[in-house]
Amino acid sequence: MIVLALDVYEGERAIKIAKSVKDYISMIKVNWPLILGSGVDIIRRLKEETGVEIIADLKLADIPNTNRLIARKVFGAGADYVIVHTFVGRDSVMAVKELGEIIMVVEMSHPGALEFINPLTDRFIEVANEIEPFGVIAPGTRPERIGYIRDRLKEGIKILAPGIGAQGGKAKDAVKAGADYIIVGRAIYNAPNPREAAKAIYDEIRGV
């Protein structure tokens, strides 16, 4: 249920945190800060140290060939899923899906998403239902939007909800609204005791 977003630069710090919370998480999400700070091999190292599936949150948004080149590298490094933007169109999304499992962005959790991304949600859901990714990104900061997306999304496609904790989203509200996974970063990795922070969130959503 919990995806740990490891948005840090230092590989050793990332591994230490991941190992301390692995009993309470389902996946680890690595983003550009960690990959740029520690190299793409951090994906393999995290998998070896924790046994947890890895999401490469690159939000790929380029032409098909460039998306394909990047995705080939991260899947080759051991990523189980790659996040891709939907707005670049079916051809760019499919270039990544041909190489492995994908997660498509249909809405984002930050305020700026209301300007350009979120007005196209219905179109993005249509594309997701056609392509059938592993999952889609929906905002944990707006549970009513999770419910809206869940009602229109094809059965079997998972919803992953970022924005839990530091951005103001509540874990239990997101799960009740229909999220299959909640994505939590700073509320865990910046906590004085990341393991206890992860356990508290785990206990909050267990049985919801």
Curated annotation (Swiss-Prot):
Substrate binds at residues 7, 29, 57-66, 109, 162-172, 185-186. InterPro entries: Aldolase_TIM, OMPdecase, OMPdecase_arc, OMPdecase_AS, OMPdeCOase_dom, RibuloseP-bd_barrel. This is Orotidine 5'-phosphate decarboxylase. Its EC number is 4.1.1.23. Pfam families: OMPdecase (PF00215). The active site is at K59. GO terms for molecular function: orotidine-5'-phosphate decarboxylase activity. One of its GO terms (biological process) is 'de novo' UMP biosynthetic process. Gene3D superfamilies: Aldolase class I (3.20.20.70). It is an enzyme of class 4 (lyase). PROSITE patterns: OMPDECASE. One of its GO terms (cellular component) is cytosol. Belongs to the OMP decarboxylase family. Type 1 subfamily. HAMAP family: OMPdecase_type1_A (MF_01200_A). Catalyzes the decarboxylation of orotidine 5'-monophosphate (OMP) to uridine 5'-monophosphate (UMP). Keywords: Decarboxylase, Lyase, Pyrimidine biosynthesis. SMART domains: OMPdecase. Homodimer. It catalyses: orotidine 5'-phosphate + H(+) = UMP + CO2. The gene is pyrF. The keyword Lyase applies. CDD domains: OMP_decarboxylase_like. Pathway: Pyrimidine metabolism; UMP biosynthesis via de novo pathway; UMP from orotate: step 2/2.
